[in-house]
A protein has these predicted regions:
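Exported/periplasmic cell-wall-interacting domains
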Residues: 63-64, 172, 186-270
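Surface-exposed, secretory/extracytoplasmic low-complexity segments enriched in Ser/Thr/Asn/Gly/Pro
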Residues: 1-191, 195, 210-212, 260-262, ...
Length: 270
């Protein structure tokens, strides 16, 4: 007996033509020292059928791919290997600094680029950008803060430009942040800071003309033994700090202010 075929040759031909049409594009994602390629082989996996049986791009499959890119290349809050000013390799995690792909917008953009057959080299749509797109997204210009050593070092292109002692509190957060804004004449506690560099929420780096690091260290050692932090609840008449902030001698703060830019990474560790 004769059995009718499930697919006829003209249907196969139509499928082949549609597949060639939908996959005739190459899109290369540029992540600086890394690349990802979307080509015919990959796009074939994103094809589905509509109610009429015609081949179409499956947007959900594209969204899944963009999610994989984000999992691989987003860096906000991730663990980073960092070389400290005293040549130690440590792991720094947390904070708000880093790259973040806007997944819904990038899904739409990639979907449309494939439909439009726009062969291109592109970067994803980002919800947040950072200073460097390399694997080392901190780069070589950054502010380094050691909470344990109470020390701040500003590097520009790998060269230390500012190196100073600091005053902190036990609530000063660690992690990787960025300079969010530069302002002058900001009210901080019972003083006005001439140089204010915010790095997260209401916290910032600023200078205090009356800051005496030696006096603060003596007070700490007398009151709290070997603690590494300033206790802002103690009665310190020469202290005007704000909980969680990083305070510098005024001269160092002025120099820091002149040399940093918004968006510059701030690496804080214990």
């Amino acid at each position: 007996c004769y059995v009718n075929p499930l697919i006829y040759s003209d249907e196969l031909k139509s499928d082949c033509e549609q597949m060639n049409e939908l996959t005739d594009v190459v899109i290369t994602y540029d992540f600086s020292d890394r690349k990802e390629t979307v080509d015919r082989t990959l796009i074939k996996e994103w094809l589905g059928r509509d109610e009429d049986g015609s081949l179409i791009l499956d947007k959900d499959a594209i969204a899944s791919y963009v999610g994989q890119l984000a999992a691989k290349y987003d860096t906000v809050g991730t663990d980073r290997t960092f070389s400290t000013y005293d040549n130690r390799d440590i792991t720094v995690s947390g904070g708000t600094y880093g790259w973040l792909i806007d997944q819904p917008k990038e899904t739409d953009a990639l979907y449309q680029a494939i439909l439009d057959k726009k062969t291109q080299v592109r970067e994803p749509v980002y919800a947040q950008k950072a200073a460097s797109r390399d694997t080392n997204d901190i780069g070589y210009s950054y502010v380094e803060v050691s909470l344990t050593d109470r020390r701040l070092v500003l590097y520009k292109s790998g060269t230390p430009v500012v190196d100073t002692g600091i005053a902190i509190s036990s609530s000063t957060p660690d992690g990787v942040y960025s300079i969010e804004e530069k302002k002058t004449g900001v009210s901080v506690g019972n003083m006005t800071a001439d140089c204010w560099l915010s790095f997260t929420d209401d916290l910032g780096i600023y200078g205090d003309p009356g800051l005496n690091l030696s006096a603060i260290t003596d007070t700490e050692e007398d009151s709290f033994g070997s603690t590494d932090y300033v206790d802002f609840s103690s009665d310190m008449t020469d202290w005007t700090g704000t909980e969680g902030c990083i305070v510098l001698p005024e001269e160092a703060a002025q120099e820091l202010y002149q040399n940093v830019e918004t968006g510059m990474p701030v690496v804080i560790y214990k």
